[in-house]
Regions:
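Extended alpha-helical scaffold/tether regions of large eukaryotic proteins
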Residues: 1-145
Length: 145
């Protein structure tokens, strides 16, 4: 979070919000880099996942399997973890004691774009309505092969 908040990079990929459209490719590259960083941090921190939540989600998975809906359990568990815990922490790191200061407007927008992308991955979705402008980009293809 600190790298994103303190860095001066721009991840804006919405053409209506970019003053110089020629910079969109650079912004996409920045967004991909920060999403990769966030994803790596999430994956490498799995050992810190609370055992109580592991138990709850294990029971949930078992119930889904009993109902012949095992494939649904992964989507629901992933969406729940990211929607309720991880993406809110990305969006508002100061509320989760991940940083002390409030981010600048640019950093807040970068965090929003990162959280939206990560949530989309967690939902196993093809795209988010607000990120439709990424649909044909190499960034989009990179994540949603």
């Amino acid at each position: 979070m600190r790298t994103i908040i303190e860095g001066g990079d721009d991840c804006e990929v919405d053409p209506t919000r970019v003053a110089m459209p020629t910079m969109i490719a650079t912004h996409q590259s920045n967004l991909r880099m920060y999403c990769d960083m966030a994803w790596t941090k999430i994956i490498t921190s799995s050992s810190f996942f609370p055992s109580e939540l592991q138990s709850v989600f294990s029971c949930f998975r078992g119930r889904c399997e009993e109902e012949q809906k095992a494939d649904l359990s992964e989507n629901l568990i992933s969406a729940s973890i990211f929607l309720r815990f991880l993406c809110p922490a990305i969006l508002s790191p100061s509320l989760f004691n991940l940083c002390q200061e409030f981010p600048t407007d640019r950093a807040a927008r970068n965090l929003t774009l990162i959280a939206k992308t990560i949530q989309t991955l967690a939902n196993f979705s093809k795209y988010v309505h607000l990120l439709l402008h990424l649909k044909n980009s190499t960034f989009f293809i990179y994540y949603f092969k």
